Amino acid sequence: LFSIDNFYKYVCRFNVKLNDFKKVNLYKLSDYLRIDANSRINLELKKNNFSNDINGSLLSVINYTKTPMGFRLLNKWLDQPLLEIEKIQRRQSLVEDLVLNSNLRNELEELLGSISDIERINSKISFGNCNARDLIHLKNSLSAVPKIKRLFLDSNTLFSNIASNIPDTEYIYNLIDSSILEDVGILLKEGNLIKIGYDEELDVIRNNKIVGKEKLIKYEVDERNTTGIKNLRLIFNKKTGYFFEVTKSYQNLVPEHFELKQTLTNANRYKTNELLTIENMIFGSESDIIEKEYELFISIRNTIKMNIKTLQKLSDIISFIDSIFSLSIVAFKNNYCKPTLNSEGIIDIK
């Protein structure tokens, strides 16, 4: 409690924002088996004593988790072995349900395999540094949630009780699904983030760009027909934008409103006032699109941020389910039997 009090004073003093801060869970020594550092090493719980990596450790034997957060929780369980018999028996019963129900176990394995690291994505959302691809990973993960919930409710096992605690994330899923492009990039200020139809203003700006491109094509055809320069063509590069290129053999047909910008060995490059007008229309639309898409993305991310507690709860439940699943796999593969526990200090092996 003294440490928590100091932490609270630090937060208040420096005005630290704790958007993703979870509730304080008190660690009671009476709840967990205390294992000293030397014993942890000698037992090779997480690393072997030969190469000092996970291979050959207890963790390597029991780890069949499908998600990063499930793996982290399984690690925590090794650090904090339970002492309370009722809690141990609850885990045992859940593991047993999966061992005895192969259909449930197999379907759960597939669904867990489609879930990304919700816990880490949630943290990035909280600190405002998640990108659009993170949201797509989140959306794809959330698509498995109602399936897991339905699977548990139909299972007639202890997992049906867990299903009732799985939060509703349909709103978050629908928000991302309706707004963020599926093949989105990582960078937020290069556009290509938001779907057509999500925002009316953005659609208008995009349409202006399309109109500009159509005008550009028509203008090229018109100038070719008017000047009689059969090989007149529009060229684009990032430094100078759009320009007309005319080969040396047609220089006598170049009209007065063509302003020379660059001389090449076999051709010259020109600008016109009309070309500049159309170019500004296209480039202006492109910059407006990027700015608007970024603005919309930040708004979407902030909306999801308001539901961060829901995502935290979901992450905790998925990690718990995944850890139980992992134990059920190792129990099934190795044909483990379920031990009966007592508080009398008796070990009876038959």
Q: What residue ranges belong to the model's regions?
A:
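Charged catalytic and DNA/RNA-contacting regions of genome-maintenance
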Residues: 1-97, 106, 110-113, 117-126, ...
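Extended, charged coiled-coil "arm/hinge" scaffolds of SMC/Rad50-like chromosome-maintenance ATPases
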Residues: 264-302
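Conserved NTPase motor "head" modules and their coupling/switch loops across ABC/AAA+ ATPases, GTPases
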Residues: 253, 316-350
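Flexible, glycine/threonine-enriched loop-and-boundary segments that flank and lead into catalytic domains
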Residues: 214-234, 335-337
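Cytosolic, long alpha-helical scaffolding segments
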Residues: 172-179, 242-258, 263, 267
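Hydrophobic alpha-helical segments characteristic of transmembrane helices
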Residues: 109-112, 118, 136-139, 311-328
